[in-house]
Structure formats: C-alpha cells, structure tokens
Amino acid sequence: MSIISPQDVKKLREETNAGFGDCKKALSVAGGDFELAKKKLREMGIASAEKRLDRDAKEGRVFSYSNNIYAGLLLVSCETDFVALNHNFVNFGNSLIKELVESGIDSLTTSQELELKNLAATIKENIQVKKIFITKIQSNEFVKIYLHGEQSKIGVLVKLKVNDFSKTEDKIFKNFAMDLALHVAAFAPVYLRNDDVCPNYIKEQEEIFTKQLESSGKPESIIKGIVAGKIKKHLAEISLLEQSFVKNDKITVKEMLEEISKAISSKVEMVEFKYLRIG
C-alpha cells in the first residue's frame, strides 16, 4: 500500500480544487497515481453532484457576451451568494457564455454539461444553467447589454435597429441605449408591444376585472368602460413600448424612440429585449 503524503494531497488539491478529505481518499484508492486520482475525484464529485439536484438553487448570476455577430445572456444558479462570487463559478459562466455566443447555439454540448457537473462537484453546491438567450445581430442592429450590481443578479439585453448605423456613434444615441437597458432592468417588462400579448391572457384579465366590479352596482356599459381602462393600464405596465420612460415619465418608450430618431436624424426601432433575473 502506497503512503500518501500531505504534499501529495496538497498538490492534488491545487490541481483540482477538491477538498482535502476527498483528495486523500482519491489518492488512496488510486494507489498514489495522480491521473487516476483525478479521475476518481471526478467520479466521486459527479455522483455527489447528482444528489444535490433536489436542493434549492436560488442564488447565482447572469453572464453576457457579444462578438458583433451574436450576443447573449446566460443565467447560472447556485445555492449561496458566496458561491456566486467564487472565481471558479465566475470563470465557468464567462467561459460558457463566450462559447455559446461564438457558436450561435443556445444549448449545452455534452462536454459543457460535464464541465457543469465537475464544477458542482468541486464547489459542492447544486449549480444549474437555468436560461440561455442567444440572438443574431444583423448589419443595421445595435445591441446594448447591462448587468446590474457586483453579483450581476439582473441581466438585460436590448437590440435596436438603426437605419443609418453610423449614428450609433452619436453620444445621444449611446446614452439612450444605456438608459433603455436601465429602464428594462428597473421595470422588467414582459412583452415588447401590446400585440405580443396572448389574446387568452387579455381575456382572462378582462374576466378578473369584470368579476371584481360585479358587486359595484354600476351599469354593464360603465363596467365595460372601466374594464377597458384597466386593461389599457395593465398592458402599459407589462409592454415595454407602452411603459413610461425611466428618464421621463411624461412620455412612453415608444415616444422616446421617436424623439431619439429625430435627434440623430435616423430612424431607431426596438427589435427585441431580454430580461433575466436571479430568484
């Protein structure tokens, strides 16, 4: 039986980031063979990682990347905010979103899934890739990405179409793009425009509002008018273009787009947005 020295255990820990006890056990099982010990650690870690999948993973962070061909956001969850700051966790997320964007694919490969399991095994938490968003950037489209706070618990991507793309260098446009991303982070719209809202959802809301007013004693025609007003207000809360703009609540985002178009002498249109949030 080979003797496992503290130096051997230390070396294996430095190479794998696994715990002292796990490294010692792996070296013992492997008879002191470092490569075999690494394999044993991976096997041990993946098995224990599978057991953690039922544990809550309510922390984490959002990662982003853009290469001017594709842009994307990635939400990776973990169990504690401490791990969300762990350099192995952060490096994994940054590396993964870069790989996904450069490939233009919004799903994990087998090797990426294995990397995820190995990370969970090393850190000993339930770590999951919750959401992946990848979008292709056309020649006349501008993408702005915003990550909120040190832990990046909110991630926003907005895509704008600009007829004269040279105008995207204008300071007015750049400030607006940033403000728009901040707006999405602050107000968390669900849809881009009213037309995107599912008709069944609107019908359900109408029924709810009508039910709430049944005991009011008001005539049916009045109730219909009130319900229509409530629906309009609700849509303005969940549709980005209808929301009051974060920097000027007297106008909507749609109206602000028109003002920016005039200010830079080029039509600016909202193409899409994505909002991701931890928790």
Curated annotation (Swiss-Prot):
It holds the Pfam family EF_TS. GO terms for cellular component: cytosol. Transmembrane segments: none annotated. InterPro entries: EF-Ts_dimer_sf, Transl_elong_EFTs/EF1B, Transl_elong_EFTs/EF1B_dimer, Transl_elong_Ts_CS, UBA-like_sf. The keyword Repeat does not apply. Keywords: Cytoplasm, Elongation factor, Protein biosynthesis. GO terms for molecular function: translation elongation factor activity. It is found in: Cytoplasm. Residues 80-83 are annotated as: Involved in Mg(2+) ion dislocation from EF-Tu. Belongs to the EF-Ts family. Associates with the EF-Tu.GDP complex and induces the exchange of GDP to GTP. It remains bound to the aminoacyl-tRNA.EF-Tu.GTP complex up to the GTP hydrolysis stage on the ribosome. This is Elongation factor Ts.
